[in-house]
Amino acid sequence: MSDNRRSRMITEGPQRSPNRAMLRAVGFGDNDFTKPIVGVANGHSTLTPCNAGLGALAARAEAAIRAAGGMPQIFGTITVSDGISMGTEGMKYSLVSREVIADSIETVVNAQRMDGILAVGGCDKNMPGALIAMARLDIPAIFVYGGTIKPGHYKGRDLTIVSVFEAVGEYSAGRIDEHELLEIERHACPGVGSCGGMYTANTMSSAIEALGLSLPGSSTMAAEDEEKAISAARSGEVLVEAIRANRTARQMLTRKSFENAIAVVMALGGSTNAVLHLLAIAYAANVPLTIDDFETIRQRVPVLCDLKPSGRYVATDLHRVGGVPQVMKMLLNAGLLHGDCMTITGQTIAEVLADVPDEPPADQDVIRPFHKPLYPQGHLAILRGNLAEEGCVAKITGIKQRSITGPARVFDAEEECLEAILSGKIKPGDVVVIRYEGPKGGPGMREMLAPTSAIIGAGLGDSVGLITDGRFSGGTYGLVVGHVAPEAAVGGTIALVEEGDSITIDADARLLQLNVSDEELARRRAAWQPRPPRYTRGVLAKYARLVSSASLGAVTDRFDGESA
């Protein structure tokens, strides 16, 4: 069987002479039409430091593919900057961009009958978007992460972008002055690369490494280091090898590999967004995975890494002491990882990890020893109760108070809530409710980093709870609960909460409860009316019509009557 299994449909035979004529115009010669055509989905953009270095990586991968005997074809895909759009209407487009990225890659690869796909991405939605496309396509595929930004430094402490969001809250609370805020702003982002803590981008790059669709050790490299460029080139070579072996994406994307990815996310202390994205990738791969699987795995996997936002270190620190392979080796030795899962390299997880030390270096505390973890169980808890019949996600590390019962402070949009926090209207003991921010209601399920950072900055992180049908940034920590489902826009109980109602968040009991009688809830439900759509034309209107519940991954190709 030839290596150009798909592209031969557009390159072989007299009837394909017009096709070849066009390909000659973009660099194909007589001897190139039997070579596999390899797509390079390039997310390069100067919108954001996360993606500003991707062009060079795509070029290195392109050259390596060509040298290995493939015919690379570069095409663009989009990105939006979560950090820049955060706290604005623009953030409604962030999760939408995941679908646009997935759809665009799938569209180009299938339209051009490409034999393999290498995707280069950096900002948060690039990773799940590319993986969703790879899962749908089920062809040889590999992901190249753009790499993490190095930390900024100011007054002897490491800074990340989250430092600036929290500084806004400190400034509003009078804890720092305008000069201090400006200096933190100036020093937080010293170069290119994705946000530096174990936020969403680094969480998802690590999950992809655990899934076997990126090179071992590549997910925590700094964007500006030469090893990242070398890794991009090697990824191109590995992809051509995978095409020759017909090693396709779904051979890696199995039930066991998703369990591995969840275990790694828990051990790293990763972002709540991993729940949403892994559910969506699994759905695209036709792998049964539910929100409850995260809770099952959480209960047996400890948090081993002391990483921001709730910890002390950043991704480059993790890389320095062994990176994701070191964490995976520890999980494998503890029986918490499936070593027989295949990777795009052709090796199993166990084979990839064979030469990794059993324990991390002794002279560091980024990765804790297994007998002395940072936390004995994972940090992404799935809560249920009458406020979240379909479930919700709580991040329960880095908090002193694991439960709260307090009066609801209800806001129907993020902006209203942020103004209340910054003006001092939120008090210790309050439970903030931000609703109509779900996948359909927002639409787009905005991340609530601005309100949560303002709460932290105001010194209320240990005394105020926050629940939302929106999402949280990977930079969020505190007593926060997101992805509440059903969401307000479809009549979920969160829509029925009234100002001053008693709400309980209990991380240990995994409970999210509105302390109102069933009779009163029934009365409110009977009186509730759905709100008219916020958008009636354009991409947000289309997204609101198509998107599923957050408990199902907020996907846009799950249709009525389809089982979970």
UniProtKB/Swiss-Prot annotation:
Cofactor: [2Fe-2S] cluster; Mg(2+)
Residues that hold [2Fe-2S] cluster according to the record: 50, 123, 195
Gene3D superfamilies for this protein: IlvD/EDD C-terminal domain-like
Keyword field contains Metal-binding: yes
Enzyme Commission no: 4.2.1.9
Keywords (A to Z) from UniProt: 2Fe-2S, Amino-acid biosynthesis, Branched-chain amino acid biosynthesis, Iron, Iron-sulfur, Lyase, Magnesium, Metal-binding
Matches recorded under InterPro entries: DHAD_IlvD/Edd, Dihydro-acid_dehy_C, DihydroxyA_deHydtase, DiOHA_6PGluconate_deHydtase_CS, ILV_EDD_C, ILV_EDD_N, IlvD/EDD_N
Gene Ontology terms: biological process: isoleucine biosynthetic process; L-valine biosynthetic process
Descriptive protein name: Dihydroxy-acid dehydratase
Source organism: Chloroflexus aggregans (strain MD-66 / DSM 9485)
